[in-house]
UniProtKB/Swiss-Prot annotation:
Name of the protein in question: tRNA pseudouridine synthase B
Function according to Swiss-Prot or TrEMBL: Responsible for synthesis of pseudouridine from uracil-55 in the psi GC loop of transfer RNAs.
Any one GO molecular function term: RNA binding
Enzyme class: isomerase
Length: 300
């Protein structure tokens, strides 16, 4: 089967556990996910089946929205609720106004240092493996983009914020850095991913929904179409001649002024056909094709 599931990941399991459960329910090996969530985090995780796995890479350019609870006055070695407490300090002096003004410093492009408990590699080893051995190493700072950050409420010592951010943002690091700026320390108490591009909590499924669909013989019916993952890409409709060229792996010429990194191609019936990318000579080549090549007519 080919398609996408918008799964609401429950607390306490890994993103790989989600993939394993989907593989079991669908009896399908070719399954992948579109964005890791830590075990303590919940919320949206798109899961791709069959040919849709070829679209996972295009999710890197879409934004994600999180609902985060941050507790002031405490730091942990993992920057979240799973770690050991490393620092305590009173936060009685912190006001809502102070928090609001400090949060505004995090809007736009910011520099983050990945937590030691992360999947980033250092000399070929995952940082979390080093951290579990009690080893701390210097991490390379990274640029992250915060499109919006909203303080929802603050009841000392816990604040709730909604964050819209780009690919590669560590909400744990944001919580840690916020605490440092306020002078009292902080850690990420809980995290919910509310949206990831076209996918959001409102139309997500849990595993009970999948099991029910399996019992009813409707597993295929709950899959989202492939193009759900690339709704953010510019699109173009092409005639049969150009579609045939793409299906056969040949480049095409488009009269386009802009040159985005990728364009979604649809046919005259409004069916998703391919992803094309520009070449330096002005042509476009098929990066991914999702309809099969028609048999060539017999030369005789």
């Amino acid at each position: 089967m080919d398609g996408i599931l918008n799964i609401n990941k429950p607390f306490g399991i890994t993103s790989f556990d989600v993939v394993a459960k989907v593989r079991r329910i669908y009896s399908q090996k070719r399954v992948g996910h579109g964005g890791t969530l830590d075990p303590y985090a919940t919320g949206v995780i798109p899961v791709f089946l069959g040919r849709s796995t070829r679209l996972i890479e295009y999710l890197s350019s879409v934004s994600k929205t999180y609902l985060a609870e941050i507790e002031l006055g405490v730091e942990t070695d993992s920057y979240d609720s799973e770690g050991e407490i490393t620092f305590r300090k009173t936060c009685d002096y912190v006001t809502r106004e102070m928090i609001y003004k400090t949060l505004m410093d995090f809007q736009g492009e910011i520099i983050q240092i990945p937590p030691m408990y992360s999947a980033v590699k250092h000399r070929g080893m995952r940082l979390y493996n080093l951290a579990r051995q009690g080893i701390e190493v210097e991490r390379i700072p990274r640029v992250a983009t915060i499109y919006g950050i909203e303080l929802l409420n603050y009841t000392s010592p816990v604040l709730r914020v909604r964050i819209e951010c780009g690919h590669g943002t560590y909400i744990r690091s944001l919580a840690f850095d916020l605490g440092r700026k306020l002078g009292c320390g902080a850690y990420l108490k809980s995290l919910v991913r509310e949206a990831y591009g076209q996918f959001n909590l409102a139309n997500s499924l849990d595993f009970a929904d999948l099991e029910a669909a399996k019992c009813d013989g409707k597993l295929a019916g709950i899959l989202l179409p492939l193009e759900t993952a690339i709704g953010h890409l510019p699109r173009v409709s092409l005639d049969e001649k150009n579609i045939t060229r793409l299906v056969n792996g040949l480049e095409i010429t488009l009269d386009r002024i802009d040159k985005p990194e990728a364009v979604a191609v649809y046919n005259a019936e409004n069916s998703f056909v391919a992803i094309i990318q520009p070449e330096t000579d002005g042509t476009w080549h098929p990066a991914k094709v999702f309809i099969r090549q028609s048999p060539k007519p017999d030369a005789n």
